[in-house]
Curated annotation (Swiss-Prot):
It catalyses: hydrogen sulfide + 3 NADP(+) + 3 H2O = sulfite + 3 NADPH + 4 H(+). Component of the sulfite reductase complex that catalyzes the 6-electron reduction of sulfite to sulfide. This is one of several activities required for the biosynthesis of L-cysteine from sulfate. Keywords: 4Fe-4S, Amino-acid biosynthesis, Cysteine biosynthesis, Heme, Iron, Iron-sulfur, Metal-binding, NADP, Oxidoreductase. It comes from Shewanella sediminis (strain HAW-EB3). GO terms for biological process: cysteine biosynthetic process; hydrogen sulfide biosynthetic process; sulfate assimilation. Belongs to the nitrite and sulfite reductase 4Fe-4S domain family. Siroheme binds at residue 482. This is Sulfite reductase [NADPH] hemoprotein beta-component. GO terms for cellular component: sulfite reductase complex (NADPH). The gene is cysI.
Amino acid sequence: MTVENVEEKLSINEHLKTDSDFLRGGIEEGLDTAVTGAFSEGDQQLIKFHGFYQQDDRDLRNERKEQKLEPLYSFMLRARVAGGVCTPEQWLGVDEISSTLTSSNSIRLTTRQTFQYHGISKRNLRTLIQSLDKKALDSIAACGDVNRNVMCNPNPVESRLHEQAYYWAKKLSDIYLPRTKAYAEIWLGDDKVATSEGDEVEPIYGKTYLPRKFKMAVAVPPDNDVDVYTNDLGLIAVAQEGELVGFNLVAGGGMGSTHGEVETFPRLADDFGFIKAEDTLKFAEAILKVQRDWGNRSNRKQSRLKYTIVKHGYDAFKAEVEKRAGVTFEPKRDVVIGDRGDRYGWIKGVDNRWHLTLFIEGGRIKDLPGQPLQTGLREIAKIHKGDFRMTSNQNFIVAGVAEEDKEAIEALARNHGLMGKLITETRGRSIACVALPTCALAMAEAERYFPDFLTKVESLQEKHGFADQGIVIRMTGCPNGCARPFAAEIGLVGKAPGRYNLYLGASFEGTRLNKLYRENIQEAEILSELDQLFARYVSEREEGETFGNFTVRSGVVKAVIDAAKDFHD
């Protein structure tokens, strides 16, 4: 069977995209329908391309059903902020929106260096998007079957190199935006334009866009805070004398899978070789187009680039990319892939400016009793002269602070609970997805439960005498993998309320996946397993050996070398 006729029956989503008039669908009519807080089933898929998902409060679902009311629908909107960089003025706008147009009264930092709002009513969607637009922010392509928010190392210590890496992240984000005018027409009030053929409106995507979401990241070694190997396309910066000369390109990563379906699996990206900086767009576009043309449009669970590469083979995929790019890969350059954590506290850059990284538990920016975090960041934004950076670990950097401004910034941070609390190495490296009560896919808690769970793990580390050592722990409410749990030394993936699958064995640096160790277990069982494993680790580990590497070397779990073959075995 040839590539051209592989797909015999298109998925429903493919028909929706084809018939949507370039992502317009019935969204505008749905906005004007006051009898329900929801959109139609088809438009619920299309609104993702505009940056938001329809949700409901699952804590109230049964109560409202008994009252014969429809679910309490609301929307989660995710902004597009390439590399996580925004100005203080923009942040003040982001902050005001959260308190005036959402019911959550909070801002949620994501694992892809942007922010999202929860609890938006349908009637407030247009006003919210227009408010973002006034601050030069938008949500187009933050979700949907397109290139999503592009990540970039946010720790600006090597300022020149970071600036060059950020340039490419921003360029990739801008160039691969959908070209349809639907977003501007529906949300910003632009005049409707007559549409033409797909290639004219969407010269890269066409009228059916990509088969599935596509994620890009730019890493600046030795930092791997962006988890570059978990992306569809990863660019690992290669520098000479502090100047960017090109990238080691990796492709085919992705975290999502489905419980009980062994044909789905997480996967880390393959190394394809070195590319010169000036060839970056040639290769990026070639990979996007190969995925557009070769990707599975019949079964969405098999539609990510990782499955395309597995299906067609590494060599065939590489050859096709080189053919379309008109350039061949060079042998990859030697780089060191290191820590995935953030540098907390003050760090001085080579330009003599200071950068303050603030730990944000669960990425949730909200005023809490004794910790008015949101107010604190608002006050900092009022006086800060540099910029802000959101990290892929759900934290917040006050970047580019002059020496004379440090004291005032730190005073505000401490007075509002943003500094001063001891953060263990493990907690500082651990992340969780939102999960309940808003995510429709969640099978178990994550964000609301994770801090207390971490406290119990920290107690076990203290008990066994290695509390000063960091372990990468991640929790998600389902196997879609938003918090990249399959790349964690300890991964917890929701299976049912209060129950999780326990995965072990990923590398500390994010260069090896973990593997299922125990299935569908509750907290007491999880902690019991970790208690025993920590005891073994302390007594049997080799010098400098990380916990993830120990669990593989000691035979607790097998190493995942080829996810398609051995993740589920």
